[in-house]
UniProtKB/Swiss-Prot annotation:
The gene is obg. Signal peptide: none annotated. Its main location: cytoplasm. This is GTPase Obg. It comes from Polaromonas naphthalenivorans (strain CJ2). It is found in: Cytoplasm. One of its GO terms (cellular component) is cytoplasm.
Length: 364
């Protein structure tokens, strides 16, 4: 399922350092020649396509990025140090456009691709550059050139790693709000979610996955009933489905098992491949069940539902069980991502040979 993630950033390459006016001062040499060095180049700003990233969420909290200025020139023909470059890691598929004109400037399409997005300014000239046959003692220098400055809009079509399934009011929006940066509209009535909600779940530094909360499915969704049929087709691109079930519905006449079977039935009717996609069962709203009754309720549900896959017990409202579920999801997503990457071709000229066997010690 694809969504458009976007962020705005301001980047500034480093300015070049100024040149230096200096003359040599040597013993017994009253009028030394010019020896002022040039300024150093300002740092560049690069963007690199990182296959381990899948959203632009980090750039929402870190908008301004500046490279270092170049050092100033010095005497004794010493040039200024060049400014340090900075490299911004972005997901593969990121499109960089000019925030003011809308012109597409760059696209990161290949994993590992690195592009120069802001060039550092050249260093200024020292007075050594101005020496001539008619001017043996120049006192001229030039300042460094300014580095590029740009306001960029970053856009990324995000592929959701995890799709949430469930009847209306199963607690999907509460779950995505509890574990991610998404803030969906939540209320105690069905069909609160009218559009897909996208959330980025942060597990650690540069460790995240994307989860999509879809409008609740109802029986007949595969044939066009309700809201869910509009989004069923997008689930085919996800790597994992979480089937969230309300174990404690407000209406005591509602059977959670029957509802869960209806969801599975819609998947099977719509697409056999979607039905066979990895699907985990998440039993929600444990906080609504007495602690001494939980084990029996869960056991009864799993037995009647006849589910053979992984089962997780959580309360999205109190976040009980959510942390462990998130860690397990991340491990699964990374495993699938790794299996999807093509194997690197090995140049036969550089295959590492096994070490030679040790020679037996000679006996004297």
């Amino acid at each position: 399922m694809k969504f458009v993630d976007e962020a705005y950033i301001d980047i500034a390459a480093g300015d070049g350092g100024s040149g230096c006016v200096s003359f040599s001062h040597e013993k017994y040499k009253e009028f030394g020649g010019p020896n002022g060095g040039d300024g150093g180049r300002g740092g560049h700003v690069y963007a690199v396509a990182d296959i381990n990233l899948n959203t632009l969420v980090d750039f929402r909290f870190s908008r301004r990025h500046e490279a270092r200025n170049g050092g100033h020139g010095m005497g004794s023909d010493m040039f200024g140090a060049k400014g340090d470059d900075i490299i911004l890691k972005m997901p593969v598929g990121t499109i960089l456009t000019d925030a003011e004109t809308g012109e597409v400037l760059f696209e990161l399409l290949v994993p590992g691709e690195q592009i120069l997005i802001a060039k550092g300014g050249d260093g200024g000239f020292g007075n050594l550059r101005f020496k001539s046959s008619t001017n043996r003692a120049p006192r001229s220098k030039t300042p460094g050139w300014p580095g590029d400055r740009k306001s960029l809009k970053l856009e990324l079509k995000v592929l959701a790693d995890v799709g949430l399934l469930g009847m209306p009011n199963a607690g999907k929006s509460t779950f995505i709000s509890a574990v991610s940066n998404a803030r969906p509209r939540i209320a105690d009535y069905p069909f609160t979610t009218l559009h897909p909600n996208l959330g980025v779940v942060r597990v650690g530094p540069e460790q995240s996955f994307v989860v999509a909360d879809l409008p609740g499915l109802i029986e007949g969704a595969s044939e066009g009933a309700g809201l869910g049929h509009l989004f069923l087709r997008h689930l085919q691109r996800t790597r994992l489905l979480l089937h969230i079930v309300d174990l404690a519905p407000f209406d005591e006449g509602v059977d959670p098992v029957a509802q869960a079977k209806a969801i599975v039935g819609e998947l099977k009717k719509y697409d056999e491949a979607l039905y066979k996609k990895p699907r985990w069962l998440v039993l929600n709203k444990l906080d609504m069940i007495d602690a001494d009754e939980r084990a029996a309720v869960v056991k009864d549900f799993v037995k009647r539902f006849k589910f053979k896959g992984p089962v997780f017990e959580i309360s999205a409202l109190t976040r009980e069980g959510c942390e462990q579920l998130v860690k397990t999801i991340y491990q699964h997503v990374k495993k699938v991502q790794k299996s999807e990457q093509p194997e690197e071709e090995v140049d036969p000229r550089f295959i590492e040979l096994p070490p030679e066997p040790a020679k037996p010690a000679s006996s004297d």
